[in-house]
Amino acid sequence: MPLKGSHPNRAKVVRGVFEGAYNYMKSGQLLRQVINKVNGIDFNNLADRKHFGDVYEQLLNDLQSAGNAGEYYTPRGVTSFMVERIDPRPGESLLDTSGGTGGFITCSIRHMRERYVKTVADEQAMQGSLGLIEKKPLPYILCVTNMLLHGIEDPSFVRHDNTLARPYRDYGPGDQVKIILTNCPFGGQEEDGIQDNFPAQFRTRETADLFLALFIRLLQPGGRAGVVLPDGTLFGEGVKTRLKQQLLAECNLHTIVRLPNSVFKPYASIGTNLLFFEK
């Protein structure tokens, strides 16, 4: 049940999306053809508009298959399974801390619209409770577009930022959320200084470990989380052991789903797992 009318924040969102982005087409003729095609689409036609989101996500999937956007895309089968298990509802604050192109949020939107959104008030409650943060400019642009094509009136909840750049201690009760759904970056390391934002017992340059520490802090009492994490976080020692102790002390880790190594190939051959826990 899409909201009607243009939102006053849309112009601000469009400006923010292209800030710092330098993608371009070499052929002016091809660019003109693309503009003409897009200009011919009636985005106010709800009969057509409802298909845009699915078409766009298929394009993102095709990009993954072509090897151009693998770091930004979690297979839809994985996102759908995780959303089904978490079962988000309108009004429950939902956060993706490393949102990529927005797959977890759009999947959650479809889930809530199919099951729980019955009135305009339900739709407003759902749209007002979403949160997403993405560090890199290209997936951020793709994500904002994805939100608009899924009928989100004001996608300003999509932030272009590094979740880990904010000091751990600065996240307080006002920042906590009911639901965390995310596939945090793994196999990489953060830049110098980021680990200093965290308590000494959790300091590491490994991105996935820092995110797990933050998930535990950001989840409300009674909140629930579904996250993708690599084998190293589960079976490693040192900081990883302390993180697991913290997780088990503060949360109920009730389900671990082992994924086949081929799920994220050719972008990563690291063993990965789905963790579901409640605080």
Regions found by a protein language model. Give the residues of each.
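Extracellular loop and loop/strand-boundary signature of outer-membrane beta-barrel proteins
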Residues: 199-200
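Class I S-adenosyl-L-methionine
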Residues: 252-279
